[in-house]
Amino acid sequence: MSMTRLLCCLVLLLALPLQPACAGLLQDRLEARQLEQAGIRVLRDIAYGNDERQRFDVYLPTSPSRGPAPVIFMVHGGGWANGDKDNGSVALNKALRWVPQGVVLVSTNYRMLPDTPPLAQADDVARALAHAQQLASGWQADPARFVLMGHSAGAHLIALLDAAPEIAAQQGARPWIGSVVLDSAAFNVETVMRGPHLKLYDRAFGEEPTTWRAASPTLRLEQAGAPLLAVCSTRRDDACPQARSFAAKARKLGKRVEVMDVDMSHRQINHKLGRDNGYTTDVEHFLRSVGLLRH
């Protein structure tokens, strides 16, 4: 940042309301300071494709622990049309919580609506996963110990890869050890589209039932695969019923699925994860059970 811009921001701190651009710069500096103090370095905008959205960030311990580190691979939400890997609620709290424990965190972007529909977004996420796994050894991380995590639309994309791992395999990704799905209400897109629903689902999934079925994790699920934790908000009408239906089908296939219903808003489920609270501790029980965190 130039001295002029920094002085501008410091002066504007004395004025109300704070200018949005300046506030963003100050927030970036604050977050960078928090990461530095926690012993975390960040590799920004690693490309896994030619589009400017095909980038991910990597949060690494400044002093790596002994042995290859496990990896959390995080996918942001935003209704398949918005959001970013840099948003504070996506990566910051999670990095501050888990990187000091010896975990590497990857936070990825992907192409979005209106140009890229969810099924192609899942391909992007799978391609990012494959590239992260290929680079993992250079971060002193273990490509065989990835846990996938996503919130909202990102949770749907992670659930889709979990239910249809051939999507990931086609992009060169290796199997992972677990998935954490943070408040998706789109396990069964066909059910959503045949009932009352928000317009964002129309923009994402259109009018073709074949597309609805292809984008439905519950309908695509045919094999056991890695364990999955589905966190759902009891303040929403559809999130927990959708998660339970997915879990019921999974159990018949011998797949381990845990449903964690929480009295939090959709936003809080993402924003509070990584903070020092019982909810984070409960998620960590799952992460330990799949071998990501030490007991």
Where are these regions (language model features)?
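N-terminal cap/lid segment of alpha/beta-hydrolase-fold proteins
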Residues: 24-65
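Mobile cap/lid helix-loop segments that gate and shape the active-site cleft of serine hydrolases
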Residues: 31-35, 51, 185, 189-220
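Short beta-strand element of the alpha/beta-hydrolase
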Residues: 68-78
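Short amphipathic alpha-helix adjacent to the substrate-entry channel of hydrolases
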Residues: 86-106
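Alpha/beta-hydrolase active-site loop
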Residues: 116-136
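Primarily recognizes the serine-hydrolase "nucleophile elbow" in alpha/beta-hydrolase
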Residues: 130-194
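Short beta-strand/loop motif that positions the catalytic acidic residue
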Residues: 230-232
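Conserved alpha/beta-hydrolase "acid-adjacent" motif
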Residues: 237-244
